């Protein structure tokens, strides 16, 4: 159940009225909500903006008419996301509710990792935490609420919509995906669930990678086994399908390759009913892999490949995805969809491919925050695709041995994050949406593995 304000206040003190938004400042904190404005003119966004019909309703920023109600906008295995109003400035934001965090040690560690990552990220194409709601006293601490930027839609909804996608759209989307992925990989982080639904998009075509529930730091020791319960099947790399106990950042690149093909063809590239069928579809396209490409595969998967008929590659069919599947596009796509992960292109090298030159130019001409315009022209940043300033540190996880220990650390972490920042917020139990909010939950927690994650 959602906590009813900070543990240092009584629930009845939280709200002067019966209604109000789902989040609010604690007792005694008042904020002025500006009327806002539509913003000044500027360079039109290119490529052409996506239609509002694909997007979440926009906040009424001019102060007129009925305010937009707080409402759920997304559900996942590890949380629920609501669209709410930040009472400190009147802006619409996304509120992620992480329920039942402290059920077991694996769940605790996973949520703590995701929380630390969201606070670590500093990149325009990676979703990060804007704020964390004030926790109650530790005895009542069961749920975590994270505020992030509110995006209008996701790439899956764009792909399945009737919205035409030009070459400009595809290039600027792919550029941003790889730009964000280069940053994550430079921090030593594997996303492990790159798919269109985890790529948030605004109508101006700005894109952010989200959902780090399965993300973890790359394991450099190849003797350490890693979980195979990662990546949605359609976007799962062949080394995972073949039972590899160790993998690296190349698994994310494979997923991006599948998404690239999906943007070109407007359909899922490898859509199978089972992991074995998924592997068969991959070899239908790429051909039978050499033994060296199956070095990390389990014996059963290797035997399945070898006892089947030898398949020649049929990569020429990629040109039939659409009229946008040019030679440069297919060349880059083939570098991403290599069976051997050691030969698969990296995010850094993919960004240097000629196919993405136009995407880079369009993004930095009118979409990014790292470049700016002056009267004499455009001032460009010295580094178009920045890396993380340091690697994400997960060494603390080795010392986590109990649920209560993690609970104390998470509580302290959230409290420390709020020091010196904006006035804190908490859940408003008197809001019209509160009853619906406390009933909204993630997918059934029993479906989430309790095995130790690696």
Swiss-Prot record:
Name any one GO molecular function.
Answer: magnesium ion binding
Q: Name one GO biological process term.
A: positive regulation of protein ubiquitination
Q: Name one GO cellular component term.
A: nucleus
Look up the EC number in the record and give it. Answer: 2.7.11.24
Description of activity control: Activated by tyrosine and threonine phosphorylation.
Catalysed reactions listed for this entry: L-seryl-[protein] + ATP = O-phospho-L-seryl-[protein] + ADP + H(+); L-threonyl-[protein] + ATP = O-phospho-L-threonyl-[protein] + ADP + H(+)
| Cleavable signal peptide | none
Q: How does it assemble?
A: Interacts with sox11, hmgxb4/hmg2l1, rnf138/narf, stat3.1 and mef2a.
- State the function annotated in the UniProt record: Negatively regulates Wnt/beta-catenin-signaling during development. Plays a role together with sox11 in neural induction during early embryogenesis. Involved in TGFbeta-mediated mesoderm induction in early embryos, acting downstream of map3k7/tak1 to phosphorylate stat3. Augments the rnf138/narf-directed ubiquitination and degradation of tcf/lef by enhancing the association of rnf138/narf and tcf/lef. Phosphorylates mef2a to play a role in anterior neural development, including eye formation.
Name of this chain's protein: Serine/threonine-protein kinase NLK2
- The gene for this chain is nlk.2
């Amino acid at each position: 159940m959602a906590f009813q304000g900070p543990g240092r206040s009584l629930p009845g003190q939280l709200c002067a009225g019966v209604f109000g938004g789902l989040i609010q400042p604690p007792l005694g904190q008042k904020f002025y909500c500006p009327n806002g404005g539509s913003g000044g003119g500027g360079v039109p966004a290119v490529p052409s903006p996506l239609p509002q019909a694909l997007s979440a309703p926009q906040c009424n920023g001019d102060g007129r008419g009925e305010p937009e109600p707080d409402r759920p906008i997304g559900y996942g295995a590890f949380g629920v996301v609501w669209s709410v109003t930040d009472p400190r400035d009147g802006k619409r934001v996304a509120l992620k509710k992480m329920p039942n965090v402290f059920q077991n040690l694996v769940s605790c560690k996973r949520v703590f990792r995701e929380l630390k990552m969201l606070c670590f990220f500093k990149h325009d194409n990676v979703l990060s935490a804007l704020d964390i709601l004030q926790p109650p006293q530790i005895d009542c601490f069961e749920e975590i609420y994270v505020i992030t930027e509110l995006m209008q839609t996701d790439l899956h909804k764009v792909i399945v919509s009737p919205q035409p996608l030009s070459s400009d759209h595809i290039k600027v989307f792919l550029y941003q995906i790889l730009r964000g992925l280069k940053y994550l990989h430079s921090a030593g982080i594997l996303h492990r669930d790159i798919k269109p639904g985890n790529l948030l998009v605004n109508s101006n075509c700005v894109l952010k990678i989200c959902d780090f529930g399965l993300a973890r730091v790359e394991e450099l020791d190849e003797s350490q086994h890693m979980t195979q319960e990662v990546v949605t099947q359609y976007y799962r790399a062949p080394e995972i399908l073949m039972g590899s106990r160790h993998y690296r950042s190349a698994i994310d690149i494979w997923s991006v390759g599948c998404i690239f093909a999906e943007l070109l063809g407007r359909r899922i590239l490898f859509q199978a009913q089972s992991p074995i069928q998924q592997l068969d579809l991959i070899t239908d396209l790429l051909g039978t892999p050499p033994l060296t490409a199956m070095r990390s595969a389990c014996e059963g998967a290797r035997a399945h490949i070898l006892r089947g008929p030898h398949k020649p590659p049929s990569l020429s069919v990629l040109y039939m995805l659409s009229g946008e599947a040019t030679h440069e596009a297919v060349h880059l796509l083939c570098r991403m969809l290599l069976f051997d992960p050691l030969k698969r292109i990296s995010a850094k090298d993919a960004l240097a491919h000629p196919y993405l030159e136009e995407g880079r130019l369009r993004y930095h001409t009118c979409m990014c925050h790292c470049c700016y315009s002056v009267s004499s022209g455009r001032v460009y940043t010295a580094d178009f695709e920045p890396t993380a300033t340091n690697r994400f540190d997960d060494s603390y996880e080795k010392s986590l041995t109990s649920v209560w220990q993690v609970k104390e650390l998470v509580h302290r972490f959230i409290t420390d994050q709020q020091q010196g920042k904006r006035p804190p917020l908490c859940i408003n139990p008197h809001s019209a949406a509160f009853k619906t909010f406390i009933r909204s939950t993630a997918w059934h927690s029993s479906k989430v593995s309790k095995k130790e994650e690696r």
